[in-house]
Structures are given as C-alpha cells and as structure tokens.
From Swiss-Prot:
Example GO BP: transcription antitermination
MF terms in GO: RNA binding
Gene Ontology CC terms, in alphabetical order: cytosol
SUPFAM superfamilies cross-referenced by the UniProt entry: NusB-like (SSF48013)
Annotated family: Belongs to the NusB family.
Database matches in InterPro entries: NusB-like_sf, NusB_fam, NusB_RsmB_TIM44
Keyword terms: RNA-binding, Transcription, Transcription antitermination, Transcription regulation
Purpose: Involved in transcription antitermination. Required for transcription of ribosomal RNA (rRNA) genes. Binds specifically to the boxA antiterminator sequence of the ribosomal RNA (rrn) operons.
Gene3D superfamilies: NusB-like
Protein name per UniProt: Transcription antitermination protein NusB
Domain of life: Bacteria
Pfam families listed in its UniProt record: NusB
Length: 156
C-alpha cells in the first residue's frame, strides 16, 4: 500500500466533503463505485477523477480512507477544538479548506492511528501543504502540528 497516495486521496476527498457539504458515506460510495468501474470493463482514468498522479487505486489503502473520513466526520467537533487550541491568533474557519483538511487528517492520526508515528504524519502533512497549498502554509502547519505533539495531552 502506498500511504503517501492514500493520504493524498483522503485529503482530496475531505476537501470535497467540505466544499460540497457532503457526508463521508456519499464520498465513500462514489469512491467505491469508481474502484468498481476501474476493475470492470468501464475502465476510467483515476487521474481524471481524483487528479494528477493518483495512478490506479489498487495501491491505495481503502480501509484507511474509509476509517479516516468517517472518523473525522464523527469526531469533527472534537478535532476542531483540538486544532484551534494550537492556532495562535487564528480560527479554523479562516484557514483554507485544504489546510483545514490536512490538519484534521494529521490530528485524527495523532489521536486514533496508533501505528503511524507522529513525525511521519507531520512530514506527510507538510508535503501535502507544499503540493496543494503554499510554502507559507506548510510552515504554518508544521508549527501547529509540532506544538500539538509537544503537548502531552495530544499524545497517544
């Protein structure tokens, strides 16, 4: 499984949920439908559906995507509160939807994905921010997440 591509797809789907105000189960259903189409005779280009360089979905950890999207949706209020504790002079609703999605995924991983080291989560979050947001956002996200893991309360 390719964790980097999996996280990237998860971020794109979480962004889609925020922009379209869709529920996780709708997004997951659409994803599974696209996987079935890719495996069947109606082969679609996953790159066309989910963006450049996604390749096919056989290297994506679909269980992770489903677990994280549902987990973020279920725990969104708690995640928002947790993230806002570390936003100095900012509110979560002022951040871009991309930055917000990246922070939610990483915070969810800190709290619920015991097999993922915190530093790996942070590095992947920074790379996503560099690719989909800005260098400034990457530094900002690094600072927020770095402060989070310094706080004993957030640690697993």
């Amino acid at each position: 499984m390719n964790r980097k591509k999996t996280r990237e797809l998860t971020m794109k789907l979480l962004f889609q949920m925020a922009i379209n105000k869709e529920k996780a189960d709708v997004i997951i259903s659409n994803l599974k439908e696209n996987i079935e189409m890719e495996q069947g005779s109606q082969k679609n280009s996953i790159s066309q559906i989910y963006g450049e360089n996604m390749g096919d979905l056989k290297n994506i950890d679909i269980d992770y995507v489903v677990r994280v999207l549902r987990g973020i949706e279920k725990n969104e209020d708690m995640l928002n509160i947790e993230i806002e504790k570390y936003l100095r002079n900012w509110k979560l609703n002022r951040l871009s939807k991309v930055d917000s999605a990246i922070l939610k995924i990483c915070t969810y991983e800190f709290l619920h994905e015991d097999d993922i080291p915190e530093k790996v989560s942070i590095n992947e979050a920074i790379e996503l921010a560099k690719k989909y947001s800005s260098e400034k956002s990457a530094s900002f996200i690094n600072g927020v997440l770095g402060n989070m893991i310094k706080d004993e309360k957030i640690k697993k």
